[in-house]
């Protein structure tokens, strides 16, 4: 049957297109829909906007050599004809039809009826549970080349899951017996046999099952929990933060060590003004030019001089000219015995040591000697 349908389908498509184009002017503004219900009844409906308030008539035949018959079972919409129902049980025929306004053809065409097949909804659907799987069965239809599709979902699923077989014996595995599942079944015609214009059957009634027992309904889908920061993400973030901190600390330590081992070299331009700007780095010319105008640069933070330089005046004179001295008895005895006066020795402190004429002096930065 499948091969025959495909072979005849191509011929009828070309023939139907030629016949429709032959009446192209009359077909303007008319849209049709054909549904072949379970290979039993053909329904042809039309939407003629140009003839919305007109009772159009439908004429048909199943053989190109026969005369047209007029429809006897019209569909009405707002009191006007909008379609026709034809009895065509188990027929693989071409439907020739013409929609007319009185005797004037409005739309004329021919179509292979099985191209618009719509199977009936599955009947006698049964469920057989075994552990974590369920087998769905129903009564097979009298014709073949069909797909039986079972869809199911639990309140925790966001979309329907689907499985289909060539016969109405579909086993679904991997189910959780503690969950409640909703099921429904439908039948579809194979596209490679009947073409792309067929219609799937209506869905069967929804059936709910839990723990192998039928339920009136499944609970509503629970609200998904708010996303929480997982331990892995938290630990990873802390590890990255620690690594970055250690890296920054290492760079700071490296900078400190580099600064300690390799001190910064001062810029000679600030120490020798004019050496490079005026003398082009010639130190001999620079020292000649600046030897009489050298400035004393004090170090920053150096102690300010507290006063003028203190002169240290040394005068060599006779000891007899000195003023009378008061001597104690022990001193007089030592002098009388011819010994010289010995002063206690104390360490010299303060600065540079200068010896002049047997006298020793300690000089600081604010002293000078005048002879």
Swiss-Prot record:
Subunit structure: Heterodimer of CRLF2 and IL7R.
Signal peptide positions (record): 1-22
Protein's name according to its UniProt entry: Cytokine receptor-like factor 2
Positions on the Cytoplasmic side per record topology: 253-371
CDD domains for this protein: FN3
Residues of the Fibronectin type-III domain: 118-211
Gene name in the database record: CRLF2
Record keyword Glycoprotein present: yes
Cysteine disulfide links: 71-84, 180-218
Gene Ontology terms: cellular component: external side of plasma membrane; extracellular region; plasma membrane; receptor complex
Comp. bias regions, Basic and acidic residues: 322-336
Iron is among the record's keywords: no
Organism of this sequence: Homo sapiens (Human)
Pfam families assigned: CRLF2-like_D2, TSLPR_D1
Motif position, Box 1 motif: 261-269
UniProt function note: Receptor for thymic stromal lymphopoietin (TSLP). Forms a functional complex with TSLP and IL7R which is capable of stimulating cell proliferation through activation of STAT3 and STAT5. Also activates JAK2. Implicated in the development of the hematopoietic system.
Family according to the record: Belongs to the type I cytokine receptor family. Type 5 subfamily.
Other noteworthy facts: The gene coding for this protein is located in the pseudoautosomal region 1 (PAR1) of X and Y chromosomes.
Comment text on domains: The WSXWS motif appears to be necessary for proper protein folding and thereby efficient intracellular transport and cell-surface receptor binding.
Glycosylation sites: 47, 55, 101, 169
């Amino acid at each position: 049957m499948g091969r025959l349908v495909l072979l005849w389908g191509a011929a009828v498509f070309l023939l139907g297109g030629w016949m429709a184009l032959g009446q192209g002017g009359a077909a303007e503004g008319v849209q049709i829909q054909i549904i072949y219900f379970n290979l039993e009844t053909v329904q042809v409906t039309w939407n003629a906007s140009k003839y919305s308030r007109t009772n159009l008539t439908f004429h048909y035949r199943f053989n190109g050599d026969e005369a047209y018959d007029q429809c006897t079972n019209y569909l009405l919409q707002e009191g006007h004809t909008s379609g026709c129902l034809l009895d065509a049980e188990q027929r693989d025929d071409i439907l020739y039809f013409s929609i007319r306004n009185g005797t004037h053809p409005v739309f004329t065409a021919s179509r292979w009826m099985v191209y618009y097949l719509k199977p009936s909804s599955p009947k006698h659907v049964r469920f057989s549970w075994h552990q974590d799987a369920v087998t769905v069965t129903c009564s097979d239809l009298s014709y073949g080349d069909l797909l039986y599709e079972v869809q199911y979902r639990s309140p925790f699923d966001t979309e329907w899951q689907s499985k289909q077989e060539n016969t109405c014996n579909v086993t679904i595995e991997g189910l959780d017996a503690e969950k409640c599942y909703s099921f429904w079944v439908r039948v579809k015609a194979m596209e490679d046999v009947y073409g792309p214009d067929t219609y799937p059957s209506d869905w069967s009634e929804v059936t709910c099952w839990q723990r192998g027992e039928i339920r009136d309904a499944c609970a509503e889908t629970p609200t998904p929990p708010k996303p929480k920061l997982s331990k892995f993400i938290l630990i990873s973030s802390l590890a990255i933060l620690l690594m970055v901190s250690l890296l920054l600390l290492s760079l700071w330590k490296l900078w400190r060590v580099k600064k300690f081992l390799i001190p910064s070299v001062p810029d000679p331009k600030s120490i020798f003004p004019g050496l490079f700007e005026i003398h082009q780095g010639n130190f001999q010319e620079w020292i000649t030019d600046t030897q009489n105008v050298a400035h004393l640069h004090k170090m920053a933070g150096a102690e300010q001089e507290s006063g003028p330089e203190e002169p240290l005046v040394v005068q060599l004179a006779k000891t007899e000219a000195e003023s009378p001295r008061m001597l104690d008895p022990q001193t007089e005895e030592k002098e009388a015995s011819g010994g010289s006066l010995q002063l206690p020795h104390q360490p010299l402190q303060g600065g540079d040591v200068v010896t002049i004429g047997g006298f020793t002096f300690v000089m600081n930065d604010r002293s000078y000697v005048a002879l």
